């Protein structure tokens, strides 16, 4: 038997042996009824990133913030959501209602300046981003809130 015949024979035996291996059964789980992440999963990091100026109807503009949420310390288990400051305000109000005896950190103050003036101020927007980062970190990484329906609603809507 030549070397090439032996290699071909070995390869055929490997394929034949693989055909004898039974497939591992697939287990499907319905996660829709729980309304939130798997109970063993948890948010391990939250990063408030860049802001984006969106042109609204009638020429008005507003800012949305990108928020990356990392689950179980895996970059592959992360999502990016985009939220306006007013969305985050409503999120905080929902947390206060759902957890009346828990101290929820404040948001950075809402400024009364015009949007045109704010859009010129990178310094002001960076301070707002830092304040939002502090708020999101303190809320989303708090073990009391990890599986809160309020957080799930904020992330998924």
Swiss-Prot record:
Main localization of the protein? membrane
Q: Which UniProt keywords apply?
A: Endosome, Membrane, Vacuole
* Gene Ontology molecular-function annotations: phosphatidylinositol-3-phosphate binding; protein-macromolecule adaptor activity
Q: Do you know which SMART domains this protein is assigned to? A: PX
Q: Which Gene3D superfamilies match?
A: Phox-like domain
> What is this entry's stated membrane topology?
Peripheral membrane protein
> Per its UniProt record, what Pfam families does this chain match?
PX
Per the record, what about its domains? The PX domain binds phosphatidylinositol 3-phosphate (PtdIns(3)P) which is necessary for peripheral membrane localization.
Task of the protein: Recruits the lipid transfer protein VPS13 to endosomal and vacuolar membranes.
Q: What is the designated name of this protein?
A: Endosomal/vacuolar adapter protein YPT35
